[in-house]
């Protein structure tokens, strides 16, 4: 049970820190109004926020549950022979529940703001494509970027948590990787690579079209993660092992 609670808390923190920074602090208009983002975090700040949540969450909770906080990560680790299949359902359940509770919290707090609105392409930091992409990217672009970036994310995770990797640096490397992933793809899909994160905020955005696009943010990240797990275990894993000495 401790593992599931840790996954719930870690995913709650990821969504609150990442999506919360996007909702509350990405854009803060200059005094007197206008469109200048004088005090807001912008894309860079939001990307750093997502990375920092994983960085801190993994250090705090990774020793309890492994610090997945993401169904795609759980699937990728399972395919890479690092995680038992019997634990997939309870882990994913805890992750999705944590994301939903965090999204509800963001929704409640956001309503207290003077400019609260669910208008726009990505209310509550939702993920989407087409009309719901921050910069209007279409379906194929969204599918490819989510697949490829989740693949890379899992390669990083599997690599830095390998038994032969330097100890103690995994949370930092994973957090920095997630930051870079957001810098690349916020304009395209608002960056998912995490089905739980996408699901939580979509449930409270008030737009059925965004819920209708959720399938892509489950399919592409999980497919990318599964391929990464397969490739790392079957192709890359032995590359880090010492070569046996010739007799």
UniProtKB/Swiss-Prot annotation:
Subcellular location as annotated: Cell inner membrane
How would you summarize the oligomeric state and partners of this protein? Answer: Homotetramer.
Report any Pfam family annotated for this entry. MIP
Q: Motif NPA 1: where? A: 70-72
Reactions that this protein is recorded to catalyse: H2O(in) = H2O(out)
List the residues marked with site Involved in tetramerization or stability of the tetramer: 19
The feature of type site (Selectivity filter) is located at 50, 182, 191, 197
According to its record, what is known about the domains? Aquaporins contain two tandem repeats each containing three membrane-spanning domains and a pore-forming loop with the signature motif Asn-Pro-Ala (NPA).
* Protein name listed in UniProt: Aquaporin Z
